[in-house]
Amino acid sequence: GNNPLKTLSPRFSLAYHINQKIDLTASIGTYYKIPTYTTLGYKDANDDLVNKSMKYIQSTHYVLGTQFLPNEGFRITTEGFYKEYNNYPVSASTGVSLANQGTNFGSIGSEEINSTGKGETYGFEIFVQQKLIKKIFYVVSYTFVRSKFSGDNGILIPSSWDNKHLISATLGCKFKKSFEIGLKYRFAGGSPYTPYD
């Protein structure tokens, strides 16, 4: 809407420098995101925009982390996080959250929607970075994450992107004359599914 007080987004962060090699960090913040244009632009048989009164999706993030710098070119960070979602879009016809409708290439949100869903995401991340040393650099990260959203029934169930395990690795080598070659690897755990007999 046009009232900025309804989407006021306070954010706070702290960093505590234990010594030259170790930092502790903490942050909390509220964020708002406009629903997708597919949802906002949906019209019924009378050519009326049925979702024009949807609320912004609200999320509040809580993060605690550490940073370890054993030497100038090497860094390890760890982070634990929890995110809480409100006003998440839910299908008016099925009562299912849009976050639980699959990750295929179909059009999601082109229907009447309510802003009644809730959700949560939580987990931790470990990030390791080696800056350029003897022509070689690398970055490796591992994230464990759980993602759950509710529809009209209020029961949190795994979302379509509840992959649990995410791994990313980049290895690079720099040569003379600004030439560089690299390899990248990504892994995402399987999507949730309902078993059947």
Which residues fall in each region the model found?
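Residue-level signature of outer-membrane beta-barrel architecture
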Residues: 6, 16-17, 30, 56, ...
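Membrane-spanning beta-strand positions in outer-membrane beta-barrel proteins
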Residues: 13, 17, 23-27, 75-79, ...
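Signature of Gram-negative outer-membrane beta-barrel scaffolds
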Residues: 1-19, 34, 153
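Outer-membrane beta-barrel proteins
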Residues: 2-5, 51-56, 115-117, 157-160
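Hydrophobic, lipid-facing positions within transmembrane beta-strands of outer-membrane proteins
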Residues: 8-14, 50, 60-64, 76, ...
